[in-house]
Amino acid sequence: MDGMHMNSTGDNPIEIDFENYANHMNKFLMAHIICMIIAYVFILPAGIVLAMAKSKAHIPVQIVYVILTLIGYIFAHISHHKASPENYYKGNIHRPVGRFFMWITFLIAIVGITTSILKKRMLKEYQPAAEAPGAMEDPEQALQRNSLDDGAPLLPREGNSSDEYLPPQSSRRDVSSEKPSIPSISFINIRSWRTIPKKWCVLQVLRYFHRILGHLWLYVGFFESCTGIVLLAGIFKGQHIFNGLAHWIKGAIFLWYGILSFGEYLGAFSEYGWAWNVVPKQLSEKRFAKYVPTKEMVESFLLFAYGVSNVWLEHLGNTDGKWNHHDLQHASLAFMLWWAGLCGILVESKVVHRLLNATLSATLGQRRSEDSEHSENGLPSYNVFPALTVFFTGIMMSAHDQTNHVSTVIHVLWGRLLAAAAIARICTYIMLYLKPPSSPWPTRPPTEIITSFCLICGGAMFMASSYDVVNKIRLNEMSPMLIMNISVAFTCIVMGLEVMFLILKGYASSR
C-alpha cells in the first residue's frame, strides 16, 4: 500500500505541509520540545529507576519532572495561540490527550508525595520511645519486612496505641527484644487483611498504584512524542492515518521489544528469571512465583494481541474500499502473527503442559510435581515461536513489493534487521540449551546484544517506512542510507541511555 497514492503534482498537500511546517517552529514551541525531551527522556526514567531502587532521591526527581512538564505545557499553550490558524492540524489528538496526561502527571506526583509522607509518619509510630544503640532500621527495609508468620493475624501490643501491631504471642520470636516491624500486605493470606490496620492497606495500595503508573508513563511519553512528531510534520491526514497507524504501531512494538530485551540482557527482571538466569530460590519458593509468566509467554501474548488488532488496519486506508494485493499481504501477515502468537501461548501454558503429560501420568500412576521442565529447575524457557514469528515477519516484509525505490530499500533493510534479530535470539537458545545457566545472576549472552540492537533499529526503520514519511524522504531528496544511519545512531543513543539508567539504579540500590 505504500506509495500507491503518490502524487507528483505541485499541489500535493503533503509537499505543502513539508515546505511550510517550519512556520510552526517559533521559540515557544522549541522551548516546549526541549522541556519535554529533558522531562521524558532523562528525568522520568531516572525517577523510575530511583523509585525501583527505593532511593529517597526519587521524590525530588519526580518534583523536577512535574515542574518541567508544566513549563513545557505552558510553552505549548502559548505557541498554539501564536500560530496562524492555517498552520493548525485540525482534529489532532496531541493537545487534548496531552492536557489529560498533564492532570494524570499531577496525580502521580501527589500519590508519590502522599505515600512518602504517610510512610514516614507510620515509621515514627513504630519507633520505640527509647532506641537502643544500633537498633535503628532502614525505613525501606522495615516496610519490606513482613511481620506476618504464615499469614497469622496481627495483635495490638498491651498498653500501647491500638495502631501498633505485633505477631501473636504464640510466635517463636521474642517480640520483647525487637521493635515492632511494619507489616507488608504484598503476598499474604487474604483472610488476614481484616486484622491489618487500614492505613497499612492504604499505604500499600498507594505504593503499587504509584509504581504501576510510573512504569506506564514511559510508554505514555513515547506515545505523546509520536503524536507530537505527527503534528509538527503534518503527516497521516485523512485516509493516510490508517497506513501511519499500522506502521508506527508495528514499528513501536519491535522498538520496545528491543529495549526490553536489552534491559533483560543487562539484568532487569532477573528476579523472575527473565535475564537468562536461574530464578533465585528465595523468590521461586514464594507464593506469588507461580503466577509470574515467563518472558516467552509475554512475548507470545503481545504478538497474538498485535496480530488480532491489526488484521484490517491497512485495508481501512483504501479510499475505494476494495481489497487489493497489498491488503491481502498485510492481512495475511497479521494472521500469521495472530496464530503464531497463539501457538507460543499454548506451548508456554502450564495447563497445556499438564494435559500433554496426562497420558504418561496415568500410565505411571503419578503426576509431575511441576508443570514444566524449565519451571522445575528454575531455567529459562526455550519457546522459539516468538523468534520464528519475528524471523518470518522480517523475511516476508523484505519481499514486500513497493511502487518506489526508496520505500522498497527501506522495507528490505528493516526486514533483514528483524530476521537478524530472530537468528541471534535462536543462537541464544542454542547456547543456553547446550550449557544451561546455573546461577541466579544474569548470564548476559552476547547474542542478545545483537538481538536488541537489530530490534530497536528495525523498529525505528519500520516506522520510517510509512507512506507519508517515505514521501517526505523523497521530497527532500534523502537516501535510504541516510535513514539507516539515523536509525543506527538513534539505536546507539537509546541503548547507551538504558545502560546509564540501570547503572544509576544499581548505584542507588548499593547505597
From Swiss-Prot:
Gene3D superfamilies referenced in this protein's UniProt entry, alphabetically: 1.20.120.1770
Topology in the lipid bilayer: Multi-pass membrane protein
Xref: InterPro entries: DUF2427 (IPR018825), YTP1_C (IPR018827)
Region: Disordered, residue numbers: 157-180
Record field: transmembrane: 33-53, 59-79, 97-117, 216-236, 249-269, 297-317, 332-352, 412-432, 449-469, 483-503
Modification Phosphoserine, positions: S147, S161, S162
Any Pfam family hit: Ytp1
Domain of life: Eukaryota
GO CC field: endoplasmic reticulum; endoplasmic reticulum membrane
UniProt keyword annotations, A-Z: Endoplasmic reticulum, Membrane, Phosphoprotein, Transmembrane, Transmembrane helix
UniProt subcellular location: Endoplasmic reticulum membrane
Family label: To yeast YCR061W.
Record protein name field: Uncharacterized membrane protein C3B8.06
Naturally occurring in which organism (per UniProt): Schizosaccharomyces pombe (strain 972 / ATCC 24843) (Fission yeast)
